[in-house]
Amino acid sequence: MRKKLIINIGRQIGSGGRIIAKLLAEEFDCKFYDREILNLAAKESGFSEKFFEQNDEQKGFLKTHFNIRLPLLADSDFYKSNFSQESLYQFQSDAIRDVAKQNDRCVFVGRTADYILRDNPNCVNVFITSPMQTRIANVCERRGCTEAEARKLIENGESERAKYYNYYTAKTWGHAESYDLCIDASILGLEGTKDLIADFIRRRV
């Protein structure tokens, strides 16, 4: 029986963190969960998956969008009466815990999985960064946008991620003390970064 392993990846937008997470999943034969968690949470909760997507890693979404997003709710009096951002977070947390319990190896991208699974001894928590200009270039290439648009997308997106993470974890998003390992992916490239993290994981577990 192989050893259980859970890899939680936090990442700056445009850093290549999601790609590296997929490479690590292949390296360690793990199941990969990014937006897939939203689908599982939607099935468990009775909410539409679109609602989880629009609320994904954003704090305060419900306060500003409550009135115009109600059609995205599934047809359930229970969930309508218990409707709050905390309830969405709880459904998502339950989905992450269930996946971690049901699989011997998995990789989670974002969504405070490192905090949700903080009592699990099989976790390795990694945060992936890159210089702003590198991330802007990556976002421009991926989305076909201007540098100014890419910078705005990064700054707005990371502001939301930080608020979300800090609120639910009482830790600080992107700060070294919140993770086992932080690494700048621009130094070694995607494959090299994956190799370094993989070596760290083998030594760590």
What positions do the PLM features span?
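Glycine-rich phosphate-binding P-loop
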Residues: 9-22
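Pre-Walker A (Motif I) flank of P-loop NTPase domains
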Residues: 3-12, 104
